[in-house]
Regions:
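Conserved S-adenosyl-L-methionine
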Residues: 502-508
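Cysteine-centered catalytic environments shared across enzyme families
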Residues: 16-366, 392
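ATP-dependent adenylate-handling active sites, centered on carboxylate activation for C-N bond formation
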Residues: 10-18, 26-32, 145-148, 155-157, ...
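Short, solvent-exposed coil/turn linker segments
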Residues: 193, 243, 466-468, 502
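Short alpha-helical linear motifs
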Residues: 81, 108, 485-486, 535
Length: 599
């Protein structure tokens, strides 16, 4: 089977749907015409296929919003949301909005959970607002009130949730001269996807306008402020750039003093049950779970199933995907039978996996090898659910390996301090890799992903546990031992005395999603490399694998560049295992893989 990126790419923009999406553009008065801007805005319509609106909300400030309604299903909840002089666009879900309204003694004017952001901001300001929100979000808020103290006629705040679960990109275009006569003010933009800015960005480069143009990830856990100064040139300027308002978890100086194991187990259960329950009860749309049969997705599915049984008699929908004979199908079926879910096995061919790669790269806006491999199955399962189910809210098990140190290479971690450091590094960068995949592969099909393992309170508690207890390598235990033990039959059974999961699932060794979709004897990475390698690399020899790996990377990068030229900086580095000699990101290539799988 031949892969022709140039043949496939021309069909993707018309066939790819992209959950809610936001778009904003500052200081665009002379550079781009409204018709052109609207065309770029509409490239993101798939994230919110149910409603779209582009609106001028302030002088030289344009807001755009695409909506997929999860809560507040009436038209009054459409965005931009406006209360007096404050206007908001937000891609997110605020899980504690009802509690916040009760605390403020405020009756909302719409059913949108995002409206609470405006009320919090008006009463308490931006920093306290961000501390109070429990949810996932990327938002742009404009305050049109004149601020005499700071001499401004408008202030805008842009913010993103602590782990970047909702995507957000920042566009910066600066020019010394425009038409060689008029000074062109700097243009700023914020959007949920690169594709809404790509053509605008390329036009600056192509026409050699200016000396500063970039598209970058807006950092999680930060906010920025833009203002118009009354006494100077009336343009929007960045006055505070990505100011940190939260850190991913507690610092090492705030570890728990009480290390009583039974108390820790109880707290782990309490925080994680809460993380899932809030995500179940705040959805007004049907729910489904992605179920690979691994520990993480199985834990999430089991607890979602437990809460759904309190709400409805209709069995929870679960989905697994893989090639014929894949490891994930086998274990997912065990979990589904144990829990009594309405399970669907999606069996795909090698050709179906391979042929969709260009679509995947266009959707996820990345060329990182690990991310692309893992995204193929994610993208196809999202596509299947969107075409065959009424479910709109899709639970996943992503984030656990970063938080709990679940990757197999962590067995080579030298000590518990390094273990803690590596977990925090993985969480800090997760928006560039796994979270990017888990959001875009699902939202690209008009669905909303929910990721309870990255719940703010849960993450902060888990990281507050002393590393000696979290670090399985120190105690020569299987990966994520503390998490597994916390939900084992020893510590948790339901009202009928039944464990949450069978032991064969609870203690199943970590298998990457991109590996688990295939057989042990024929891994997905090797299938891809067969298709993407050049003929002259298919020779016997010690360097054959490295050549095939390079060709795979080149194919992904070339495909990415065909959609998003001059944007290679959007990923900071290639994701790779650490603490060991690795030429591939697949755990199946590591020297100790078979040892762990047979343990």
């Amino acid at each position: 089977m031949e892969l022709n990126v140039y043949k496939v790419m021309n069909t993707i923009i018309n066939k790819t749907i992209i959950m809610c999406g936001i778009f904003s553009l500052f200081n665009n008065k002379y550079a781009f015409k409204n018709k052109y801007i609207n065309e770029q805005f509409m490239l993101g319509k798939g994230r919110g296929p149910e409603f779209s609106k582009l609106e001028q909300v302030h002088d030289k400030l344009l807001f755009g919003f695409h909506r997929l309604a999860i809560n507040g299903l009436n038209n009054e909840s459409n965005q931009p949301l406006k209360i007096d002089d404050v206007t908001l666009i937000c891609n997110g879900e605020i899980y504690n909005y009802k509690e916040l309204y009760d605390m403020m003694n405020i009756t909302p004017s719409t059913d949108s959970d995002c409206e609470v952001i405006i009320h919090l901001y008006r009463k308490y300001g931006i920093e306290y607002t961000l501390q109070m929100l429990d949810g996932v979000f990327a938002f742009v808020l404009v305050d049109n009130r004149i601020d005499k103290e700071n001499n401004t006629s408008g202030n805008v705040y842009v913010a993103r949730d602590p782990y970047g679960i909702r995507p957000l990109y920042m566009l910066t275009l600066s020019s010394n001269m425009f038409d060689k006569l008029d000074v062109l003010p700097p243009i700023y933009g914020f959007a949920s996807e690169i594709k809404m800015f790509s053509n605008i960005y390329q036009s600056f480069i192509k026409n050699e306008i200016g000396n500063n143009y970039k598209i970058e990830q807006f950092m999680p856990g930060t906010y920025s402020k833009l203002s118009i100064n009354i006494s100077s040139q009336p343009i929007w300027r960045v006055v505070k750039y990505q100011q940190t308002y939260t850190m991913p978890g507690f610092s090492s100086t705030k570890m728990l003093v009480d290390n009583d194991y039974d108390s820790i187990i109880k707290n782990i259960q309490t925080y994680f049950f809460s993380a899932i329950k809030k995500r179940v009860i705040t959805s007004e749309r049907p729910i489904a779970c992605l179920l690979s049969g691994g520990l993480d997705s199985s834990l999430v599915t089991a607890i979602v199933n437990m809460y759904m049984k309190e709400i409805t008699d209709v069995p929870l929908e679960t989905y697994s995907i893989g090639l014929e004979g894949s490891e994930d199908h086998k274990y997912a079926r065990i979990v589904a039978d144990y829990l009594g879910t309405n399970h669907t096995e999606i069996v795909m061919t090698e050709e179906e996996f391979i042929s969709v790669i260009p679509e995947v790269i266009y959707a996820i806006e990345s060329y990182d090898t690990t991310t692309v491999r893992a995204s193929i199955g994610n993208y196809l399962i999202g596509k299947y659910i969107s075409e065959h189910s009424e479910a709109k809210v899709i639970f996943n098990g992503d984030g656990s390996d970063e938080l709990c140190g679940g990757y197999l290479y962590m067995h080579k971690c030298p000590d518990s301090i390094e273990f803690d450091k590596e977990c925090r590094r993985l969480l800090k960068d997760i928006h560039t890799f796994d979270v990017l995949r888990s959001d875009k592969c699902i939202s690209t099909h008009g669905l909303e992903p929910r990721t309870p393992f990255l719940d703010r309170a849960w993450v902060q508690y888990y990281l507050s546990i002393h590393p000696d207890i979290r670090c399985h390598t120190k105690n020569k235990q299987c990966e994520k031992h503390l998490l597994r033990d916390s939900f084992s039959g020893k510590y948790f059974v339901d009202k009928n005395g039944k464990p949450l999961l069978p032991d064969v699932i609870l203690w199943r060794t970590k298998e990457a999603f991109s590996d688990g979709v295939s057989k042990n004897t024929r891994s997905l990475y090797s299938i891809i490399q067969e298709y993407t390698s050049l003929d002259d690399t298919k020779e016997e020899g010690g360097e054959q694998h490295e050549d095939m790996e390079r060709n795979e990377k080149k194919y992904y990068k070339d495909t990415f560049n065909s959609y998003y030229p001059n944007m290679e900086q959007i990923i900071p580095y290639y994701w790779m295992p650490r603490y060991c000699s690795a030429s591939s990101s697949s755990a199946r290539t590591l020297d100790f893989y078979n040892e762990k799988m047979n343990h």
